[in-house]
A protein has these predicted regions:
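Alpha-helical transmembrane segments of multi-pass membrane proteins predominantly involved
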Residues: 1-342
Length: 342
């Protein structure tokens, strides 16, 4: 109910912003919107107010602070199978909308929406990572860490189209897309393990429920550990390279502000890593709390899928060029009609 009510409110914000966008430009076609803004024929005051509502609605849907209040409760309260979907599919959809709407349609307003996204990124990094380390519920911890991951991803948008440079736009958007895909894979793995454990007679909710998992199911413990290491950004995982690409994009414009943002992102990543490494410690070094652990009777397909996704975290971490090129090509195709890339 909370997700439905707040999600409806966010949709209202987004639709209200889009209606203002139409009122300011007279069109809902993104190329025409961009042309209207570039030619200064759009009504500026209405356009800026609409932009505020659009960014607020997108931030709410994404789960970026300070529009995050629904995320921990929904992740904890929903069945793990539903949480798995919420952690992946909506994030990819909202990311695609952000690319199309902000970058393709409102690129000329980049200084304005970049400032808004920078505030969202800083709030998400601070609130998400600091809150994650204090959680004892596994799904709630992953929810708070998701907020922190959203903040890291948004940092790439802060430097997109810096000084009108379309190459920096391509690199920044590709870095953010790569980051979102790497997070999605890790989230699918982590929530997939929790879902597998939860369906065997008890609900895997607390971190203590993972105690000693390595003793009776080392495969699942190993896959979960890979997911946590990737989310923490440990080298040789895709999460490390994703964070590196975002920081590299951020520092292509080495201003004092961008350097400060990079330092904040690194510090908050170290703080957030404590939450991820604590799960690994619980799985590998704590004794099982249950004298009779639930028998994990997973089919071959489930085991193969989890193993494949876990392997992707390593493969794309060691050989990231293929996935990164796909991201860059997707961005080039999106921007070709207005930037001449490719």
């Amino acid at each position: 109910m909370k997700y439905f009510i707040l999600g409806s409110l966010a949709s209202g914000f987004l639709l209200y912003g889009l209606s203002m966008l139409y009122g300011a430009t007279g069109s809902m076609l993104l190329p025409e919107v961009l042309q209207s803004v570039m030619q200064h024929t759009a009504k500026r005051d209405i356009l800026m107010l609409g932009l505020v509502f659009i960014v607020a609605g997108l931030a709410f849907k994404l789960g970026a602070a300070p529009f995050h209040m629904w995320l921990p409760d929904v992740y904890q309260g929903a069945p793990t199978s539903i949480t798995l979907i919420l952690a992946a599919a909506p994030k990819l959809a909202i990311f695609a909308v952000m690319l199309r709407l902000l970058v393709t349609g409102l690129l000329e307003l980049a200084p304005q929406w970049q400032l808004m996204l920078m505030v969202l990124a800083v709030c998400s990094l601070l609130i998400g990572n600091l809150s994650a380390v204090m959680q004892s519920n596994a799904k709630r911890m992953l929810a708070w860490s998701t907020i922190g991951q959203n903040g890291f991803m948004l940092l790439a948008f802060v430097v997109s189209h810096a000084n009108g440079n379309n190459l920096s736009l391509k690199d920044a958007c590709a870095a953010s897309m790569f980051y979102m895909l790497s997070y999605t894979i890790a989230a699918l793995v982590s929530f997939g393990i929790l879902m597998l454990l939860s369906r065997e007679g008890y609900e895997c909710e607390n971190l203590s429920d993972l105690s000693g998992l390595n003793h009776h199911r080392p495969l699942y413990a190993g896959i979960m550990a890979l997911s946590m290491l990737s989310l923490a950004g440990v080298p040789l995982t895709v999460g490390f390279y994703a964070k590196f690409k975002v920081l590299h994009a951020l520092l292509t414009v080495p201003t004092t502000l961008h350097i400060a943002l990079a330092v904040l992102a690194i510090v908050m990543s170290v703080v957030g890593a404590f939450a991820y490494l604590r799960i690994i410690k619980i799985m590998f070094f704590d004794a099982p709390e249950h004298t009779q652990p639930a028998a994990l009777q997973a089919g071959y397909g489930v085991r193969a899928t989890l193993t494949f996704n876990g392997a992707l975290l390593l493969v794309f971490g060691i050989l990231p060029a293929g996935l990164l090129q796909l991201c860059e090509q997707a961005i080039i195709n999106m921007l070709r009609h207005m930037s001449g890339l490719g």
